[in-house]
Amino acid sequence: MELSKWIIEEAEQLGFDACGIANATVLEEESVHVEQWLEKGHEGEMSYLTRNKEKRYDPRLLAEGTKSIVTVLYNYFPKQLLGDGKHFKIAKYAYGADYHDVLKRKMRQLLERIEEQTGKLLGSRIFVDSAPVLERAWAVRCGLGFIGKNTALIHSPMSLTASRSQHNKEELDINPTARRSRRQCGGSFFFIGHLFLPLELEETGKPLPNRCGRCNKCIDACPTGALETPFHIDARKCISYLTIEYKGSLADHNPTAFDGWMYGCDICQDVCPYNRFSLPNTEPEFQPSEQLLAMRGDDWKKLTETEFETLFKHSAVQRAGFEGLKRNIEFISSGELRDAVHDNE
């Protein structure tokens, strides 16, 4: 356990909000849920999710020699919302620099420290939303949270989730990493990263029980009905999928239902009671530029490709591309026009 504890402490020193370790094994139960989801075609046009499934379920096939999974969480909750918070909205995770680059850089530092501590060149793999890895499943296995009804990982440090002193003791025993959250922030606005290590490390936590209870705020709030049932999302109806991954026409959808979201969507997270524990992130690279903060409705409608490249040069918004974002802007604008006509009738 000494090395495991040391890794968690080093992760904390590097600025990660939580860290946990689990043994590399087959995700049998999780694979059943994924297969059922795929059978329904709810992945939409994300065909990459149907490939390399064996590697997705068994990390040892993805990175030969892997014995332990180190999972880290990094807070991205912003200090302020872009624009007026009502029109032409961007998901909070994309306010600043591309999280893939930021997290991988920090995780390389963690790996270098582990290699220095062990005296071994480990040749480990770093994954940040860029390979067939069931990220949230491993975060749960590492004791860093539970999956909410909105399918997001909800990080719940011991002090936030335990309701009674006896429960405090029980969760501390189950989940010793819980108390290591730097600022005791919780909720779902976290990036997830993984180190696949060829080291046999002691596990530092166990899966937490689901704590959604009878709350259905996320399901009730989804304007497109993407959350058909608890813990299940139909990507084909999801605003995030439609504005980022989907490349076709949005003509068959109701622009008003998109509620002003032009890249991604945070509705099911914003309404989650656990996100009252969110705290503003302190990562300089996640802060939006002054140019982005100054953008308003007319600016978005007149957006040029040159302006797009300036605003989102190192941003995750590049995944949608200029043409994709323009499509979304025009689609949302058509809804505003429709609403204006309706109000004047």
Regions found by a protein language model. Give the residues of each.
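Iron-sulfur cluster-binding cysteine motifs and their immediate structural context
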Residues: 13, 26, 217-241, 258-285
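Short, flexible, mixed-charge acidic loops at enzyme active sites
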Residues: 82-87, 235, 302-305
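Auxiliary alpha/beta "docking" domains used to position bulky ligands
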Residues: 1-211, 250
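Generic recognition of stable, solvent-exposed alpha-helical segments in well-folded globular domains
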Residues: 2, 6, 105, 109, ...
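Alpha-helical scaffold domains
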Residues: 250-345
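Structural motif
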Residues: 244-250
